[in-house]
Swiss-Prot record:
The lineage of its organism: Bacteria, Pseudomonadati, Pseudomonadota, Alphaproteobacteria, Rhodospirillales. The keyword Metal-binding does not apply. It comes from the Bacteria. Belongs to the class-II aminoacyl-tRNA synthetase family. This is Glycine--tRNA ligase beta subunit. The gene is glyS. Its main location: cytoplasm. One of its GO terms (cellular component) is cytosol. It comes from Paramagnetospirillum magneticum (strain ATCC 700264 / AMB-1) (Magnetospirillum magneticum).
Length: 688
């Protein structure tokens, strides 16, 4: 069995594209081999900033022999038909077989093909993969018509120790490559993957991104510990830097003290966004005046010149940040509000100033429902977007809200207002903390609900995988705010209030928006609770009742329904419900009528139907009492008492009695089972 080694050596591949590219290369070549019937033991791909590598082990020297049969014309067919068949198969009449198929005697061609050499297939598949490679962005270079993410320098392609002459544009594969751009740029020849890996290491290249990541993290943590500090965790930055270096060398640098009065978030964001530096923290969690840079160089002076150069660049960056910070604080947030009228929120939904007016009013509405101070909530919402016109947020949009908090405190606003400004975008994802302070919750809800109502009202709803306005995230944020804070919030009422704050002519009515949004929340709630093992069909079964817009109450009902269905009584009653519903549906269709209302007690002949009617009456009262107190577990327990009388009814009573009045009465009794159970959930939506 043989090995295939492929290296595509180019200018620097953007870090964000590397992992996907390695997966795509492995997948495309593997699929191409499979289509040609060539199997192998393992395929692994690697990527560095300058090289995309694939190694496939356990390959045969040739593909399998193939035997193919083609049926031709009848033996009695004219010569013209025979000529076409012979031409398509490349055979003579003497080489054909004659077979009686039962429908006549036909010619058959049995074509035996030797398996193609694997090297030939590898060349074809590799060139095809490169020609159709799905880079998010690619370019042409020189006089070439081909495209690649960055100009290709060389291609290395070896199969069983021999060169596979892969050609792509001006590059034709050989057995040569080069090491680190600065530390070992000389070309060298390789024999196989083991030789390649060893020589790359000697040439200052760590091929495996997992190894580079580990080296960066371990080195950075070691330097931090030596300073008595901790490395600020940042998986995104770690992944990006891993894709920027082939030979990582962590170094520690210093931040000038004059910058340390700038908010830590600004310093961290500036270092991360512009310089790809890791921040270091003191034992109390505050930012230390140190940073870690990952160099791609080993130097004779131990990195002193590299550190000095990076500190010089950082001073310029942080000088800009400090200037923005000082400049922004000279103008109060409230004075910035008129500028929001110059910013469009969305063409059909007005300006950011319009949105601020709406969320301020809505935050006041919500505050009264959740026990927050209405005036404080309205004030916080009024200032929540003001930092969008500041210099720092213009430079670092990810700091919006957070900088508003700093500026609000600088202006003398209360901590409650400042905290609500900072938190009003939260939670932005499953890893983001959820606001708990009542005012912060009111403003965060108002901001998200306003967006959902507006976009749904103009039919800009998420479709499939497309969600350009992050409305799914907004809905999940609302769900978390409500559930994690235990808010008894009537969402329908809030949606109608939000619709009323829009001055624009919206396409859909408030009622349509409320209905669409409640269904949207049901779908998002199912997604949010899936990780907790809550079945989506149970959520649908409760929502389908209609009128349930209290998410806390809905969750209690779902939990009670789940526990009920997990019980023996619940599982068996569900079977009986389906049986009853099926019978009623069939008979209603047959009679062209609806069996509703109460069964006539005077027409109950058998003990089992009398017992069922009595049980339905008792259970109905018990369910009513439980629903008043929202004791849904008790309501389900009451429902469970129907199991035995329902089972006895089906065992002993003939529903389709010969006497028409008895038949109708018994069908009404079955319909009453559905009605009784339907007060707690739409059991027709329950799966399984």
């Amino acid at each position: 069995m043989a090995e295939f080694l492929l290296e595509i050596f180019s200018e620097e591949i953007p870090a964000r594209m590397q992992a996907r590219a390695a997966d795509d290369l492995r997948g495309m070549v593997s699929d191409g081999l499979a289509k040609n019937g060539i199997t192998f033991d393992a395929a692994r791909s690697y990527v560095t900033p300058r090289r995309l590598v694939l190694v496939i082990e356990g390959l045969p020297l040739a593909g399998p022999d193939v035997s193919e049969e083609k049926r031709g014309p009848r033996v009695s067919s004219p010569a013209q038909a025979m000529e076409g068949f012979l031409k398509s198969t490349g055979m003579t009449v003497e080489q054909l077989e004659q077979r009686d198929t039962g429908k006549g005697v036909f010619y058959f061609a049995v074509i035996n093909r030797k398996g193609r050499p694997t090297a030939e297939v590898l060349r074809e598949v590799t060139e095809g993969a490169m020609a159709t490679f799905p880079w998010p962005k690619s370019q042409r270079w020189g006089a070439n018509s081909i495209r690649w993410v960055r100009p290709i320098q060389s291609i290395l392609a070896l199969f069983d120790g021999s060169i596979v002459p892969v050609a792509f544009g001006p590059a034709t594969a050989g057995d040569m490559t080069a090491g680190h751009r600065f530390l070992a740029p000389e070309p060298f020849r390789v024999k196989d993957f083991a030789d390649y890996l060893s020589k790359l290491r000697h040439a200052k290249v760590m091929l495996d991104p997992v190894e580079r990541r580990h080296a960066i993290l371990a080195g950075a943590e070691g330097l931090a510990a030596a300073e008595g500090l901790q490395l600020k965790a940042d998986d995104g930055l770690l992944a990006e830097v891993t894709g920027l270096v082939e030979w990582p060398v962590p170094l520690v640098g210093s931040i000038d003290d004059k910058f340390m009065d700038v908010p830590a978030e600004v310093l961290i964001t500036s270092m991360r966004a512009h310089q790809k530096y890791f921040s270091l923290l003191k034992a109390d969690g505050s930012l230390a005046p140190r940073f870690i840079v990952i160099s791609n160089m080993e130097t004779d002076d131990g990195g002193k010149a590299v550190v000095a150069g990076n500190q010089r660049v950082l001073r310029a960056r942080l000088s800009d940040a400090k200037f923005f910070w000082d400049t922004d604080r000279k103008q109060r947030l409230e004075a910035r509000l008129p500028k929001l009228a110059e910013r469009t929120f969305y063409a059909s939904l007005g300006t950011v100033a319009d949105k601020v007016d709406r969320i301020s009013a809505l935050a006041g509405n919500i505050a009264g429902m959740i026990g927050a101070d209405r005036a404080v909530a309205e004030r916080a919402a009024r200032l929540a977007k003001a930092d969008l016109s500041t210099e720092l947020v213009g430079e670092f949009p990810e700091l919006q809200g957070l900088m508003g908090r700093y500026y609000a405190l600088n202006d003398g606003e209360t901590p409650e207002v400042a905290d609500a400004i900072a938190a009003h975008y939260s939670p932005q994802g499953p890893g983001d903390s959820c606001p708990t302070a009542p005012v912060s919750v009111a403003v965060a809800l108002a901001d998200k609900i306003d967006s959902l109502v507006g976009f749904f009202a103009i039919n800009e709803k998420p479709t499939g995988s497309k969600d350009p306005f992050a409305l799914r995230r907004a809905a999940l944020g609302i769900i978390r705010l409500v559930l994690e804070n235990g808010l008894r919030l009537p969402l329908s009422q809030v949606i109608f209030l939000a619709s009323g704050h829009y001055k624009a002519n919206l396409v859909n009515s408030p009622g349509e928006v409320a209905n669409d949004l409640l269904n949207f929340f049901a779908d998002r709630l199912a997604v949010a609770l899936k990780e907790k093992g809550v079945r989506h069909d149970l959520i649908t079964a409760i929502f389908s009742l209609g009128g349930e817009d209290d998410l806390v109450r809905l969750l209690k009902r779902v939990e009670a329904l789940g526990a009920f269905l997990d019980s023996d009584d619940g599982a068996n009653l569900l079977i009986a419900y389906r049986r009853a519903a099926n019978i009623v549906r069939i008979e209603e269709k047959k009679d062209g009528t609806i069996f509703s209302g109460y069964a006539d007690i005077q027409l109950l002949r058998q003990d089992e139907e009398k017992a069922l009617e009595h049980a339905l009456s008792d259970v109905g009262q018990a369910v009513s009492n439980a629903l008043v107190t929202e004791d849904f577990a008790a309501a389900m327990a009451a429902l469970a008492r129907l199991r035995r009388p329902v089972d006895a009814f089906f065992d002993k009573v003939t529903v389709n009695a010969d006497e028409a009045p008895l038949r109708v009465n018994r069908l009404k009794l079955l319909a009453m089972i559905g009605s009784a159970m339907g007060r707690l959930a739409d059991f027709s939506k329950v799966e399984g």
